[in-house]
A protein has these predicted regions:
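Acidic/polar, glycine-rich intrinsically disordered N-terminal extensions of enzymes
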Residues: 1-138, 143-145, 150, 163
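Structured core elements
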Residues: 74, 119-123, 130-132, 171-173, ...
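Exposed alpha-helical structural elements
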Residues: 68, 72, 100, 182, ...
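Glycine-rich anion/phosphate-binding loop at the beta-strand->alpha-helix junction
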Residues: 231-361
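Small-residue-rich
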Residues: 110-113, 117-218, 223-226
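Catalytic cores of large soluble enzymes that bind and process phosphate-bearing ligands
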Residues: 30, 61, 65, 89, ...
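Charged/polar, solvent-exposed surface patches and flexible loops
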Residues: 44, 57, 75, 185-186, ...
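Short glycine/serine/threonine-biased micro-segments
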Residues: 108, 115, 124, 145, ...
């Protein structure tokens, strides 16, 4: 298939299997209808007749849209070293792009396969579970499995959920400080809180407002809403409920202006003291008691050495680094690998891995 256009010179197309085919302007065979459509779309993209963002709407076949983007990228990157890296070696076949287009990924032109390792088994609250870990970091799965074995040998782990509230904090502006304080007092009053709770209940079958604290900065307010979201992470439902709540508030405060539905006091996907102190999402505590036999035979250490290491590394070392919630060894490694394997928002590992490891001899 020729990937050159009337506006661009020929180039070598490098295929995922490593072979190269010389693309020329001379037609050695009559292109298929699919190839003709792809070539015309690439030409239209290069000429500005077709907008990149409209490709999915114009091309009804999701896989054809992927081929067009890959061909377009090859044309645009002629002579650049990035060509082979970003297109030719990127897998794209054997994937159902209809599941992601206009849903969770724009401008798709391939996918990244990540190996998934199985860690465990692990005994948690009397139940045996396995941990799927998607990673390219050697020894991570083996390390986690070793930890699981140590916990199992000592009777398993017990857990407790201590808090359960997703948060979102919009930034709202009022014309003066006095109006901002008035809005704060109303939101935190029993009347205001009940009105907000009712709006949340009407907006979602699962999202329930359980608390709100309002921070005033000049004539701006940052109400930090806390809501239970059932088994879902819940960012969409809480954001939708807050949008409706603000509309309700504007009936009372007609000078209230939305600056942003997320004012960064949430705090979403960023290391923040407010998450460390007040929590965000589900707060979980896990506990296990390692036997001396396990520490000696499996971990090759003893309680005194292990507790001392935890103090000097995870507590003192982290404090010297100015860590915010990073008083652990590698929580983010495990959380990120599990999120990748289970299709969660990987960027949420920031607040999800904020934790402290404590040990007592």
């Amino acid at each position: 298939m020729t990937l050159s256009t009337e506006n661009h010179t020929p180039f070598n197309q490098v295929h995922p299997n490593g072979s190269q085919q010389e693309a020329t302007t001379e037609n050695t065979s009559i292109p298929t209808q699919q190839e003709a459509r792809i070539l015309k779309s690439v030409s239209d993209l290069c000429a500005g007749k077709l907008k990149f963002k409209d490709l999915d709407k114009e091309i009804k076949n999701p896989f054809d849209a992927v081929l067009i983007r890959r061909a377009f990228l090859l044309v645009q990157c002629q002579g650049m070293n990035v060509r082979d890296t970003f297109s030719s070696d990127l897998p794209f076949e054997n994937y159902d792009y209809s599941d992601v287009m206009e849903t969770c990924c724009e401008n798709a032109f391939g996918y990244i396969p990540v190996p998934v390792g199985l860690a465990g088994q692990l005994n948690v609250d009397g139940t045996t579970v396995y941990l799927p870990l998607a990673t390219t970091e050697g020894a991570l799965v083996a390390s986690v499995s070793r930890g699981c074995k140590a916990i199992n040998m000592s009777g398993g782990a017990t857990t407790a959920i201590t808090s359960d509230a997703m948060t979102r904090a919009p930034c709202l502006r009022l014309p003066s400080l006095s109006r901002a304080v008035e809005a704060k007092r109303w939101i935190e009053s029993s009347e205001g809180f009940k009105a907000l709770q009712d709006t949340f209940r009407q907006s979602s079958n699962h999202c329930r407002l359980i608390g709100v604290s309002v921070h005033v900065v000049g004539n701006h307010i940052y109400p930090r809403f806390q809501a239970s979201t059932g088994d879902a992470m819940g960012m969409n439902m809480i954001t939708h409920s807050i949008r409706n709540s603000i509309s309700m508030m504007q009936n009372r405060f007609n000078d209230l202006e939305i600056i942003s539905l997320s004012g960064n006091l949430c705090a979403d996907k960023k290391p923040a003291a407010v998450n460390w102190v007040e929590g965000r999402g589900k707060g979980v505590i896990a506990q296990c008691r390692l036997s001396s036999v396990t520490m000696s035979n499996l971990l090759k250490t003893d309680a005194k050495q292990l507790a001392g290491l935890n103090t000097m590394k995870n507590h003192v070392g982290s404090a010297m680094a100015g860590a915010s919630g990073g008083f652990n060894a590698q929580a983010s490694n495990i959380v990120t690998a599990m999120y990748l394997a289970t299709g969660q928002d990987v960027a949420q590992n920031v607040e999800s891995s904020q934790c402290i490891t404590t040990m007592e001899e």
